[in-house]
Amino acid sequence: MAEPLLVVGLGNPGDNYARTRHNVGFMVADLLAARMGSKFKAHKRSGAEIVSGRLAGRSVVVAKPRCYMNESGRQVGPLAKFYSVPPGDIIVIHDDLDLDFGRIRLKIGGGEGGHNGLRSVANALGSKDFQRVRIGIGRPPGRKDPAAFVLENFTSTERADVPTICEQAADATELLIELGLEPAQNRVHAW
């Protein structure tokens, strides 16, 4: 039996972070779990919450680390080891300041762009060569600190678009699973 793909939505645990820009990865992971018809449960060895099943015809484990964003690797590393998933078969869904609000991009490897959650995952895996679903949250206005900006709730105008953006990011994740990186990029980057 082929090893599953590991899909990780990044975010911070707790109700006070649930609607923040930094938590779009969790929002998309929740949508994927709903599409799989499953609910998250605790994974004892890693501490993350997981859902196992099938997406786009593949065996998939969707995970939400239950530690803070900057420590995500502490739970992603043990999950990857437990399921014997190499970095190239891991998809991390995360917010991205360098993309305009609502833009979705797919890539593999590369830098972290100041995203400490990505840095933590890369350090835990010993590799940056995992796939990424990048969800644009835009840059903070004026001289606002990016670290504070990502922990704020979406504006009321943005909030109206977040459900559609998360659905598109979930669709992009399924295309990545089904088609592989380059064909999925060709489709998603044309949106």
UniProtKB/Swiss-Prot annotation:
Pfam families: Pept_tRNA_hydro (PF01195). The keyword tRNA-binding applies. GO terms for molecular function: peptidyl-tRNA hydrolase activity; tRNA binding. This is Peptidyl-tRNA hydrolase. Signal peptide: none annotated. Transmembrane segments: none annotated. It is found in: Cytoplasm. GO terms for biological process: protein quality control for misfolded or incompletely synthesized proteins; rescue of stalled ribosome. The record marks 95 as: Stabilizes the basic form of H active site to accept a proton. Belongs to the PTH family. GO terms for cellular component: cytoplasm. It comes from Mycolicibacterium paratuberculosis (strain ATCC BAA-968 / K-10) (Mycobacterium paratuberculosis). Its EC number is 3.1.1.29. It is an enzyme of class 3 (hydrolase). Monomer. The record marks 12 as: Discriminates between blocked and unblocked aminoacyl-tRNA.
